[in-house]
Regions:
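Alpha-helical phosphate/pyrophosphate-handling elements in metalloenzyme active cores
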Residues: 1-10, 20, 32-47, 54, ...
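Divalent metal-dependent catalytic cores for phosphoryl transfer on phosphate-bearing substrates
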Residues: 1-129, 185-194, 236-240, 259-266
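Alpha-helical scaffold within the catalytic cores of cyclic-nucleotide enzymes
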Residues: 38, 209-220, 275-294, 320-332, ...
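A short glycine-enriched loop-to-beta-strand structural element that forms part of the catalytic core
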Residues: 52-59, 245, 295-310, 337-355, ...
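Cyclic nucleotide signaling catalytic output domains
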Residues: 312, 327, 674-678, 688-700, ...
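Catalytic/regulatory signature loops of cyclic-dinucleotide turnover enzymes
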Residues: 332-342, 371-386, 663-669, 689-714
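Cys/His-rich short segments
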Residues: 380-495
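Long, compositionally biased charged/polar accessory segments in the mid-to-C-terminal portions
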Residues: 703-851
Length: 851
């Protein structure tokens, strides 16, 4: 990145810093002036320093028009970048009316980005807090909390401390971005009482910096040096020119890559493969940004195998994108024989496509739909002539087997570099041989949940002694990914092979700049800190007395219709200006918000750190003092995959639903599949069947549903499929139906009126009748055998009569049970819910040692 473009980017990142100052001091002055005064104390007297101050001081039209600046002053670029990022012109500057009224309210907190997304709802707000991995999550709430002057003063002191250590003009672009993110992510950009305060100051300044860098690159390529003419005098006309380029990338083959494993060491391998994909995509993004001479300010979104980057629409940029895609895919073919593929699409767009205020001539383009179509087209013709020639040439580097090469026992790729698989079970009698990639992925899964190893480095060549390094595709060929210690980083930097660093969950501090990568690395551990394996997770189901079927729960879930919602969510057709909220900063804020939920907040939900007013959900008794016995295998983008003790996983799933509803203000829903399996069953088959359950839930009208393990008797008795649920026997419910009807009504009724061994069987009370497991089985089988609203009432009545107690004091309770069972049995939906409730009860009553 050239010095001038870098300066424009930093000016964009700092242009509104005065908003913090004005809210911290309550001075009656424009925020642009206060911001320039604040930053001045950290600068020298060079021309670059003076230029930065002019950008901050004159980024509004009123001041800029009378400043008498040269036509090539960057202040004109920042002015236009600010307008485009905010999505409108003629905005009042904070501080304009401080002496005339209460138009700006510095007490306002950040609104939830979902307040104006896809329909009306009661607004929710975020408290003013920093972004910290060690603290509890900042959930939105319905109360308009107050952002205090003292809180803003604290933010101001934090920036002052950092800027005194290193001047902002001397910082790397990504370093400055990180400082702003830490403190400004929950600070509202605007406190104008006539506007929605749903864009954070961080998101707005980030997008302003990104837009400024794009404008500078575009003008440089076209030889434009009259910034005043392009960005100020004739900016309205130029907003209809396709200056910008939205770049989207998407990994294909993710499912096949993740689940192509053996049962030995399955948990670590799953976690390692999922994390590898995350870092591989982050590395691709950094390779692309480096080739485009841009920073992470231009990264709109990166998670779940997808990314969006805002760049300049020039031939140079489009050629660079094609070149990066080609080189990355060459590396992926070499490493994984085409299992993974990166599809990239580009869509030119103009400033008016990014702004709320378009003129009447311009027809606004739906950016994300258009670029998604380009990505889909790229997937239809994967490779260019160079890669195809290699693939079809049996003597090429891709196809030629080295002398002595053998097939890897995990991925089945032939190589001459095999060694014992690190996931081999001791004393198992088999020695699986694995390639360096598969063994490296196993080590990566182990390192991911090691609290002492939170930094991962990409090296340009394999360092001496780094046996656990994994090859990763890059523009320069293959690079190497490995967990790192501070000493390692220093050694590799001195050797000149350290390319970049990724910091897991923001816990790394050093002189080396690292990109933060939020990871939901929750894993249940035993008393000595060892991560539970599949068998131990299944064993931890139920209670500690041996009750509760020993089964592993598997959950797969993703957001319902997120793609369509993302495309249309900010478009309100009933409004005079339907696209008033469809601004670049809002899409960036929405993307960041979703990524933060699935990569960071999900970990807090696993730890039962829930919004105020939401208590952890339990199927049976409360386990408030115990952590959830679950593992996050993968969580990112808009989907997740977890395994765990089946009852704990069910509790987590309901917690997730409730928290997601709060987080998105009820605007988005998700559907899930949850299956129960023997811990020795094939993990790839578990994932496949649970994925089918997830699809079944999504096929329910309105989606917003959960599909549970099969409800047929063969589920209990047929062990040939490892206890896997058959899709046709699954029970599908909306979340409200499951929470309120299955659990809130049926399960609770059974627990309150029956003595159930393993649940409440030790409670000898005359308001509960004894009910054995075999009798409950017979009742459940009769209910399952009914068709529609037709029921064999005679057989049902006979079986139900077996519950009738001899003791008179239990008669009233029996009559309640009999009456309620009849009511539920004759109605199809009620009967289905009762069957599911009985299933859960029976699973909880079964002994762990039962098959």
């Amino acid at each position: 990145m050239s010095e001038k473009i870098s300066l424009a980017l930093k000016a964009g990142l700092l242009h509104d810093v005065g908003k913090v100052c004005i809210r911290a001091t309550h001075e009656r002055q424009r925020h642009s002036i206060l911001g320039a005064e604040f930053i001045r104390s950290f600068l020298a007297d060079t021309e670059a320093d003076k230029q930065l101050l002019r950008c901050i001081k004159y980024h509004h039209g009123r001041e800029l028009s009378g400043a008498g600046l040269d036509i090539d002053d960057l202040a004109y670029v920042i002015y236009e970048a600010d307008n485009i990022a905010a999505g409108a012109d003629r905005r009042e500057a904070e501080g304009d009316l401080n002496d005339r009224g209460a138009k700006f309210d510095s007490d306002l907190c950040l609104e939830n980005i979902f307040n104006v997304f896809s329909g009306d709802a009661e607004p929710s707000y975020f408290s003013l807090r920093e972004l910290d991995a060690m603290k509890k999550e900042n959930f939105p709430h319905g109360n308009k909390s107050i952002a205090t002057q003292g809180q803003y003063a604290s933010i101001m002191r934090y920036m002052e401390k950092n800027f005194r250590m290193k001047s902002p003009i001397s910082m790397e672009e990504n370093e400055l971005l990180r400082i702003l993110e830490d403190k400004l992510i929950y600070v509202p950009s605007s406190t104008n009482t006539e506007e929605h305060a749903d864009i954070s100051l961080y998101d707005h300044m980030k997008m302003t910096g990104a837009t400024a860098a794009v404008l500078m690159k575009y003008m440089k390529t076209l030889g434009i040096t009259d910034y005043k003419g392009f960005c100020f005098t004739h900016n309205k006309e130029n907003r209809n020119k396709d200056v910008f380029l939205m770049i989207s990338g998407d990994f294909s083959g993710i499912q096949k890559f993740i689940y192509h494993i053996r049962s030995e060491g399955a948990m670590r391998m799953l976690r390692g493969r999922s994390f590898y994909l995350d870092i591989a995509l982050e590395n691709i993004v950094d390779e692309l940004l480096n080739a485009l001479h841009l920073s992470r300010a231009n990264l709109i979104y990166c998670s779940g195998g997808h990314f969006y980057i805002l760049a300049d629409n020039t031939k140079e940029t489009q050629d660079a994108v094609k070149d990066v895609a080609k080189k990355i895919n060459q590396g992926l073919v070499k490493l994984f024989s085409g299992t993974l593929y990166l599809a990239i699409g580009c869509e030119p767009l103009c400033a008016n496509d990014l702004m709320a205020e378009s003129d009447t001539v311009h027809h606004k383009k739906n950016i994300f739909r258009s670029v998604s179509e380009k990505v889909s087209m790229a997937k239809l013709s994967r490779y260019g002539p160079d890669i195809l020639t290699e693939l079809f040439n049996e003597n090429s580097n891709v196809n030629r087997a080295d002398q002595g090469a053998r097939e890897c026992g995990i991925c089945h790729i032939s190589t001459d570099r095999l060694s014992s698989y690190k996931g081999n079970r001791p004393n198992a009698g088999t020695d699986i041989q694995a390639c360096e990639v598969c063994n490296g992925l196993y080590d990566l899964g182990k390192a991911l949940i090691d609290d002492k190893r939170s930094v991962f480095a990409v090296l340009s060549e394999k360092a001496e002694g780094s046996d656990r390094a994994i090859p990763i595709s890059a523009c320069s060929g293959l690079c190497w990914l490995t967990a790192a210690s501070p000493d390692d980083l220093k050694q590799w930097a001195e050797a000149g092979i350290l390319k970049r660093i990724y910091d897991k969950n923001g816990s790394y501090t050093s002189s080396f700049m690292a990109s933060r990568l939020w990871v939901a690395d929750y894993a249940a551990k035993n008393e000595i800190g060892k991560v539970l394996d599949f068998n131990e997770l299944a064993e931890s189901s139920g209670d500690k007395t041996g009750k509760g079927i020993k089964r592993l729960g598997v959950l797969r879930a993703d957001v319902d219709g997120l793609g369509a919602a993302f495309i249309a969510g900010f478009i309100h057709k009933e409004n005079k200006n339907p696209e008033a909220y469809a601004t670049l900063s809002r899409y960036a804020a929405l993307s960041r918000s979703m990524a933060l939920f699935f990569r960071k907040i999900i970990k807090g939900i696993c730890k039962k750190e829930l919004p105020e007013g939401i208590k952890p959900f339990y199927l049976f008794e409360d386990k408030d003092g115990e952590p959830r016995k679950i593992h996050v295998v993968y969580s990112g983008g808009d989907d997740l995959f977890l395994v765990g003790a089946w009852d704990d996983l069910m509790g987590f799933t309901v917690d997730l639903k409730r928290v997601f509803s709060v987080y998105t203000n009820g605007k988005l829903t998700f559907s899930a599949g949850l299956g129960l399996y023997s811990s020795t069953y094939s993990i790839s088959r578990m994932a496949e069947v649970t994925g089918e359950l997830e699809e079944l839930a999504k096929s329910n009208p309105g989606k917003n549903s959960i599909a549970l393990f099969g409800s047929g008797t063969e589920y209990h008795r047929n062990e040939k499929n490892g206890g896997a649920a058959e899709k046709e026997n699954a029970a599908v419910y909306t979340w409200d139906e499951f929470i309120e009807k299955v659990h809130g009504e049926k399960i609770k009724f059974l627990m309150e009126h029956m003595l159930l061994d393993g649940i409440n069987g030790n409670s000898k009370r005359n308001d509960r009748i004894p009910a054995g497991k075999s009798l409950l089985y017979r009742l459940m089988n009769l209910l399952q055998g009914a068709a529609g609203d037709r029921m064999d009432l005679a057989r049902f009545a006979y079986t139900l009569a077996r519950l009738k107690p001899k003791e008179k004091e239990w008669q009233p309770c029996y009559e309640k049970v009999r009456s309620r069972f009849y009511q539920w049995a004759v109605k199809e939906e009620e009967r289905k819910e009762l069957v599911t409730a009985l299933q859960f009860i029976i699973y909880r009553m079964r002994d762990k040692e039962e098959a």
